Amino acid sequence: MASSRTLGTFRLPPLPTIREIIKLFRLQAVKQLSQNFLLDLRLTDKIVRKAGNLTNAYVYEVGPGPGGITRSILNAGVAELLVVEKDSRFIPGLQMLSDAAPGKLRIVHGDVLTFKIERAFPESLKRQWEDDPPNVHIIGNLPFSVSTPLIIKWLENVSQRNGPFAYGRTRMMLTFQKEVAERLTATTGSKQRSRLSIMAQYLCDVQHILTIPGQAFVPKPEVDSGVVHFTPLTRPRIKQPFKLVEKVVQNAFQFRRKYCHRGLGMLFPEARRLESTGKLLELADVDPTLRPTQLTVSHFKSLCDVYRKMCDEDPHLFAYNFREELRQKSKKEDDKQSCRL
């Protein structure tokens, strides 16, 4: 583990370009892994500047690939940069960067979805949740294939104040498909408003910082990308367990073009669905004819608070899954058909 230290200005020595690194190590983007490389260091410098002042910061980079953003982070004067890369083909190129920046770059060959970050940096960096954010940052050009499950995982970590957020309100600067970036930051009533909008915005201040055109990447993806900045809130806008909030929000957006009562009704068994849905909406003071995209975070706070009380009254309610009820119903129908034959 690195020790806390004050560093002077640092610049990497002359190195092969990212394009030359790709050629030298015969690297090719794997389409199945949604890999796309940023080669323009002016653009990677811009992304890193948007993360804020990184002088003497401790940075966790996910999915560094051939190291474009990695170089820009190192040149920002960080105290230490920890990169986690799953694809072994990129390790030699990253090792070249490590050799050029002694003591500043740590490389972990592993999976960001399972890597334990909470013990990676000095204990002295930890801050109380109500204090200013710690000098720890997460930066990453995420492969599109893992971006949504990863941000949901980290949002759950925010709610539990563990993982990267064991240090405090760790800030994140992450690249997504533009459509995902727009969903994360969508306002009430927007056509992009979604489950991701609510889950991100009830826990964090979320800003769509930058759009990166597809032609900036090699190979060129079919869609543009968006850079999103997250700062965890000192107080979540919904004070209920993450899994409960997630369940309510997921069900609300089951039928995004229909009235909200349609999806919210799926929280309850069919035998009492109409009655329980009416009770939920009445006690939460939510208009049943609103579309899911028209629901505010405050609406979801009320819905989650009432649903929590209903779960407390009925210990079996939270475990209810309408898909399982449909499956059991379908199985019974199949059994009846078999008996008739």
From Swiss-Prot:
Pfam families: RrnaAD (PF00398). Signal peptide: none annotated. It catalyses: adenosine(N)/adenosine(N+1) in rRNA + 4 S-adenosyl-L-methionine = N(6)-dimethyladenosine(N)/N(6)-dimethyladenosine(N+1) in rRNA + 4 S-adenosyl-L-homocysteine + 4 H(+). It is an enzyme of class 2 (transferase). S-adenosyl-L-methionine binds at residues 38, 63, 85-86, 111-112, 141. It is found in: Mitochondrion. PROSITE patterns: RRNA_A_DIMETH, SAM_RNA_A_N6_MT. Residues 1-27 form a transit peptide. Its EC number is 2.1.1.-. GO terms for cellular component: mitochondrial matrix. One of its GO terms (molecular function) is mitochondrial transcription factor activity. Its main location: mitochondrion. One of its GO terms (biological process) is rRNA methylation. Keywords: DNA-binding, Methyltransferase, Mitochondrion, RNA-binding, rRNA processing, S-adenosyl-L-methionine, Transcription, Transcription regulation, Transferase, Transit peptide. Interacts with mitochondrial RNA polymerase POLRMT. Interacts with TFAM. Bound to the maturing mtSSU until the late stages of assembly. Mitochondrial methyltransferase which uses S-adenosyl methionine to dimethylate two highly conserved adjacent adenosine residues (A1583 and A1584) within the loop of helix 45 at the 3-prime end of 12S rRNA, thereby regulating the assembly or stability of the small subunit of the mitochondrial ribosome. Also required for basal transcription of mitochondrial DNA, probably via its interaction with POLRMT and TFAM. Stimulates transcription independently of the methyltransferase activity. NCBIfam families: ksgA. Belongs to the class I-like SAM-binding methyltransferase superfamily. rRNA adenine N(6)-methyltransferase family. KsgA subfamily. This is Mitochondrial dimethyladenosine transferase 1. The lineage of its organism: Eukaryota, Metazoa, Chordata, Craniata, Vertebrata. The gene is TFB1M.
